[in-house]
Amino acid sequence: ITDLTVGYQLYQNRELDELELSESTLTTITSDTSNAYNDQLCEKRPTKYAYDFHFNFYCLNSDGTPNENWNKAVANRAFRRCFQEGLNLIPYYARFNKINPLKCENNYYTMKGVCYNSKGTDYVDLVAKELGIDGEKYDGETMVHLRKSTADSIAALKKQAMDELTAIGVTFPVKAPFFFVAGNTVAQDNATVLKQCFTDSFGDDFIQLELGTYVSSLAKEVRIPKLHGFVINGWGADFGDPVNFVGQEILHDDNAYYSWYYSNSAKVVEAGPADWQKDL
């Protein structure tokens, strides 16, 4: 059911056993403990996929010309660090789990207990150490990546990114093209909440989501034409094989589908990196 207003009416009439809720309906129910449906909410079953932001380093405009403003911005390490260290996604997580939003936080490609190195160390623990979040656990209150961040540290990182990018001709706010399927109220609500997360985290003078829609195929209408600033995609195949997934992201051979059609980093290498792409 793509029209959740109609779906909610069907649920109220006992014509449906379960239903995903629109953002407005969910907020209405959760904000009132006496609501008739407040005690009927339950967490959805987790999927087997690891969902991640996938940046596009070779974004094009609709006319096929390079989106230089975004491409220069996303190539900057301080700019990307703002996503990792300053973007509060709890309201967005709540779109998928209103009861325990932070259960949706995903810091790794691979789950714990899946693979170990020759010394018996869990692969996830090795990654956590590299990320500086070793030992951090779910607490139901804060995102792991934001625990070491302060308002001052994020303001300084934002200023660094803006100063470095202004010097190479980037104008602000940087628009990040983000697409959702047309006619789907859930997808529209998700995108709207995500856009607000950027506003709440950084203000409107730095990064803004530029929302767009596609009709039926994200791949054919958005990814292959390279129109996205980033996409959120789930990795499910070979979930226990981190080498395969990392290879998909960073290698440039013909089989590295992600680097050719998601990040387009292989295109950058093929064309020859510009001076401002040296960090990549």
State each model region's role.
Residues 74-200:
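Append "and occasionally in soluble cytosolic enzymes with long acidic Gly/Pro-rich linkers
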Residues 72, 79-81, 85, 89-96, ...:
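Extracytoplasmic/peripheral linker and loop segments enriched in polar/acidic and small residues
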Residues 59-79:
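Short helix-loop capping/hinge motifs at secondary-structure junctions, enriched
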Residues 1-63, 94:
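Extracellular/periplasmic solute-recognition and catalytic clefts
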Residues 7-9, 27-31, 53, 62-66, ...:
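Extracytoplasmic/secreted cell-surface and envelope-processing proteins
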Residues 46-48, 76, 169-172, 222-226:
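Extracellular/periplasmic catalytic domains that process cell-envelope and extracellular macromolecules
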Residues 17-21, 51-56, 82-86, 93-94, ...:
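Structural recognition of the beta-strand scaffold that forms the well-ordered cores
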Residues 11, 16, 21, 35, ...:
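Periplasmic binding protein-like
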